[in-house]
Amino acid sequence: MIRLGRISYVNMAPVFYRLEAEVEEIQGVPTELNRRLLAGELDVAPISSIEYARNADRLRLLPRLCVSSEGAVDSIQLVSRKPLEHVRTVAVTPESATSVVLTKVLLPDADHVPLGEEADAKLLIGDAALKSAFEDPTPHYDLGRLWQERTGLPMVFAVWACPEPLQGGLAELEDALVASVRLARAEPERLAFEASDSYGYPAGFLARYFEKLRYSFGPRERAGLMTFLELAQEAGELDEVPELRFVREAVPA
């Protein structure tokens, strides 16, 4: 049975909405899934795009899936009372790798400290970022929006990676994941209400949130990913930009 990683945030609800596949589902925050995939404890998982790039010689990608946004994403936020041009320290979450590097790309002069320490701004991701937007009146800066304003491209936060040697059945699993996303898109109200019951956010809020998320790994997303990796390399966060290697040749999403 395929060991399938699942990010333990509400952003996975569309992907697992009606997943028709026999899998062992293993949940964790992004950095935990990164570690477990590279340790051989998972057969496929959505992992931080920067961690894929750092380990691309050991991994292959599902060609039709990612987690991205075209502009604002809501669940990746810099919270700061200071204007961004005046931010010199950022307290960063231990749960994300891509967002931390994206912060370095967007704010190259800011030093990073662990979340909880005194800083000009703090980086929140996932459900913590969504909750903060409800509860904290401090200005929030959406990293997906900031990225698009800088590059004009989508920001790919995660890719679906598989360690070599590859487990059998991955192409069929990708088909099932894509089918689940398509059904979720066709039933947005039901998706939002079910996710509201599971995660506690208002259904209307989740419906708007899910509209901002993208799961197809098309040409624009790949261009956005490669641009991010090139800028990460310039920032000293990546030794080299890898060629993308896939489980199989891409088919229309």
Locate each region found by the language model.
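Pocket-lining segment of extracytoplasmic ligand-binding domains
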Residues: 112-195
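Secondary-structure end/capping motifs
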Residues: 167-231
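Phosphate-rich cofactor/ligand-interacting catalytic cores and adjacent structured alpha/beta frameworks
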Residues: 66-69, 119
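Hydrophobic residues within well-ordered alpha-helices
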Residues: 37-38, 232
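Periplasmic-binding protein-like
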Residues: 68-77, 135-164, 205, 209-212, ...
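Beta->alpha turn/N-cap motifs
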Residues: 7-11, 29-31, 41-52, 58, ...
